[in-house]
Amino acid sequence: MSKLQIIQSKGQYINGEWIKGNGLILESTNPASGTLLWQGNNATDEEIANACYVAHRALKSWANTSFEERARYTKAFVEQVEKNREQLARLISLETGKPLWESQTEVSSVIGKVNLSIQAYQERTWPKQTETAEANACLRFKPHGIVVVLGAFNFPAHLSNGHIVPALLAGNTVLYKPSEHTPAVAELIIQCWHDSGLPPGVINCLQGNANCGNTLLSQDIQGVYFTGSYATGLRIHQQFCNRPEVILALEMGGNNPLVIDEVKDIDAAVYHTILSTMITAGQRCTCARRIIIPDSQTGDLFLERFAKACKLMRIGSFDSQPEPFIGPVISHVQALKHLHAQKQLIEMGGEIILPMSLLLEYTGLVSPGIIDMTRAKNPPDEEIFAPFAQIYRYNHFDEAIQLANQTRYGLSAGLLSDNKDHYQQFYQNIRAGLINWNRPTTGAASSLPFGGVGCSGNHRPSAYFAADYCAYPVASMEQPLLTTPVQRLPGLVLE
């Protein structure tokens, strides 16, 4: 990529305007080539404080805007995304390394999220009224106020959108800090909001690294919506330990299990396992990290075909031909981190079946890896965010469930099995927020809640249930005319 193709940042988006930043240089690169893609600035403390100020100033008017009017703005946003569909998909692929086919599905998810969010708000936070003998019992919902959305790099448009849209529909104003790996995607998304006619100050975008994020969280805010690693989520939780009035919605990934039962269609099991482990270069929080297979002929045959399919998998830049199944991990630094994690597992007794290897220097391109950890001693309960699968063998189904539950996390879990009774046993005993049967662990629907238990979250599921953490309930007993009760309580004399 030549220097002429480098995207120069529009700046920070504050109060409906792009303001050229004055902070330290911030850059994003194409992880498939290592070349510079976007250049801008970290938000300064003053810019962050100013964004918070204008979000507060815009709050009252926005919160008092009718739901129908707020929904109209979100639909106008969808129209802008539709107009920029091809550009947005290409930008996602350039900045994350995803194949173009996958980026196109992400753009479709962004578009589809709005109507689902409107429906969810109307179902979960719509006003209700019940008449009693003495008064009207009313339930209404109010926005929290100014909420911070911290974006993730793996779905830079869709995951942030899954917080922003419900927050705006509920009447909150938003301070959005995208992942420092995907600032260009964020700028285009914010431009779509700008072109929708959204009032100034309702959404503000601040680019920056973790230090900018910390400064942002120290402001006068009422909510934080985060998708990312457990380590970062834990730090956010600790940062707000003395501010219980701030609502936190934390989605923090997992060390997800996929159990392979005795199945007739081995190829189907291999296919769904690949979609569970390797899609998005293993960079989905619902990716299966641990594949639990029977210690039998079925298990041997499955593992042989799984390894062969991973070895033959096409990996490369999004514009490669023929089209790849996966691209790189998000950066060269992360690729080296994952390779180091693989080395540590080998030192613990893991047996390499297919080594994960760096395919091109100075990039995030790595090949899929498979390691058998059955005989390893005390394997770490950590999420390796890469195309890398750990194999564990079991002798009976009860043992498979026991192995699956050996994690402090609890986001997703899956079972590939022709046995309905085994699925019922699996479902009843597995502790996870998403439990799939004969579907990839990465399979999820925006019409359902999305979240985990344990160290995977703090019981604030997103997707269809995002409306729940974007507004708080207000219960009211109301009577239009002040009257004295006919029957008064004993012991009171009114003259």
Swiss-Prot record:
Keywords: Arginine metabolism, NAD, Oxidoreductase
Gene3D superfamilies in alphabetical order: Aldehyde Dehydrogenase, Chain A, domain 1, Aldehyde Dehydrogenase, Chain A, domain 2
UniProt key word Oxidoreductase: yes
GO molecular function, one term: 1-pyrroline-5-carboxylate dehydrogenase activity
GO cellular component, one term: cytoplasmic side of plasma membrane
EC number: 1.2.1.71
GO annotation, biological process: arginine catabolic process to glutamate; arginine catabolic process to succinate; proline catabolic process to glutamate
Function: Catalyzes the NAD-dependent reduction of succinylglutamate semialdehyde into succinylglutamate.
Record-given protein name: N-succinylglutamate 5-semialdehyde dehydrogenase
Active-site residues, record numbering mapped to chain: 251, 285
NCBIfam families attached to this UniProt entry: arg_catab_astD, PRK09457.1
Keyword Oxidoreductase: yes
The family this protein is said to belong to: Belongs to the aldehyde dehydrogenase family. AstD subfamily.
PANTHER family for this protein: DELTA-1-PYRROLINE-5-CARBOXYLATE DEHYDROGENASE 1, ISOFORM A-RELATED, DELTA-1-PYRROLINE-5-CARBOXYLATE DEHYDROGENASE 2, ISOFORM A-RELATED
Transmembrane region(s): none
Catalytic activity: N-succinyl-L-glutamate 5-semialdehyde + NAD(+) + H2O = N-succinyl-L-glutamate + NADH + 2 H(+)
Protein origin, superkingdom: Bacteria
